[in-house]
């Protein structure tokens, strides 16, 4: 897709998601013709509102694409043994091709132990350490985490040159920062990972052709923190002093300086 960026162009994720869905529908159709009906198992403990909202979104997306789903509802007080037993059963079920464990878990469950139980071949959310390691090695046979993958897909969709680009990733979590850095490195970008202890942070970010903000601090990136004409991907979801949702980037002060920015 050819995009001529004007100053401060807002780039959105929906066209990217729609294109990915279109491609997936074709892939699922081909699998069905071969006698394979892709199925996702969603494992949920209790009935937290955020889990239910995420689950509804996943079910809707799967329905659109043509992927079968099964919701495995577990009691809030489930034991470690019973949770792991449920996962092993899904691992062995040949009719289930993907497993999504909704998190965070209740306190009685040991997340570190659970992530070694899920089958890496069915771990669609990059929960397994094996899939995390594959990202570090540049091995594309595993499942990368969704949000870092979305960052790369958005940049590609809008024809942002990654090969040789100077990229600053603000945040070092295993949820976004580290995997996003590795995925961008695999695209031959030159990546600098920034965090709370980075010296001269503003100097580092203001030299980046592409800035990925994923630190979880409301509007911390201001005009002086970005390079003229840079591309900014704001992953942060925060609440500002007025109680409004906002990102890590102060969009109002940055938009006129950059070439493209996510809302």
Residue ranges and their predicted role:
Residues 103, 215, 235-236:
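Glycine-rich, N-terminal phosphate-binding loop of Rossmann-like dinucleotide-binding domains
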Residues 11, 98-162:
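Anion-binding alpha/beta catalytic cores of soluble intermediary-metabolism enzymes, centered on
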Residues 82-94:
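Short, well-structured alpha-helical segments in soluble
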Residues 2-21:
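N-terminal amphipathic/basic leader segments beginning at the initiator methionine
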Residues 45-59, 139-231, 240, 246-255:
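Glycine-rich phosphate/diphosphate-binding loop of Rossmann-like nucleotide-binding domains
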Residues 62-77, 191-193:
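Short beta-strand elements in bilobed, periplasmic/extracellular small-molecule ligand-binding domains
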Residues 10, 20-26, 34, 44, ...:
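Adenosine-phosphate binding glycine-rich loop
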Residues 112-132, 236-263:
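Rossmann-fold NAD(P)-binding glycine/threonine-rich loop
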């Amino acid at each position: 897709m050819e995009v001529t960026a004007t100053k401060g162009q807002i780039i959105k994720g929906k066209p990217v998601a729609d294109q990915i869905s279109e491609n997936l529908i074709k892939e699922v159709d081909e699998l069905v013709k071969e006698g394979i009906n892709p199925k996702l198992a969603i494992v949920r403990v209790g009935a937290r509102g955020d889990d239910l909202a995420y689950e509804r979104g996943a079910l809707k997306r799967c329905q659109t694409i043509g992927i079968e789903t099964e919701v495995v509802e577990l009691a809030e007080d489930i034991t470690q043994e019973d949770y792991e037993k449920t996962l092993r059963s899904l691992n062995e079920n040949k009719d289930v091709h993907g497993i999504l464990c909704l998190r965070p878990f209740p306190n009685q469950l040991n997340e570190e132990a659970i992530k070694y139980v899920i089958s890496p071949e069915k771990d669609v959310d990059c929960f397994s350490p094996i899939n995390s390691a594959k990202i570090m090695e540049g091995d594309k046979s595993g499942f990368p985490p969704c949000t870092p993958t979305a960052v790369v897909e958005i940049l590609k969709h809008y024809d942002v040159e990654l090969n040789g680009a100077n990229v600053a990733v603000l945040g070092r979590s295993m949820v976004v920062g580290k995997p996003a850095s590795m995925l961008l490195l695999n695209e031959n970008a030159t990546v600098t990972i920034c965090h709370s202890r980075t010296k001269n942070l503003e100097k580092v970010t203001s030299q980046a052709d592409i800035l990925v903000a994923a630190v979880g601090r409301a509007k911390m990136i201001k005009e002086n923190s970005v390079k003229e004409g840079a591309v900014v991907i704001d992953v942060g979801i925060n609440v500002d002093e007025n109680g409004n949702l906002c990102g890590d980037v102060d969009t109002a002060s940055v938009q006129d300086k950059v070439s493209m920015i996510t809302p």
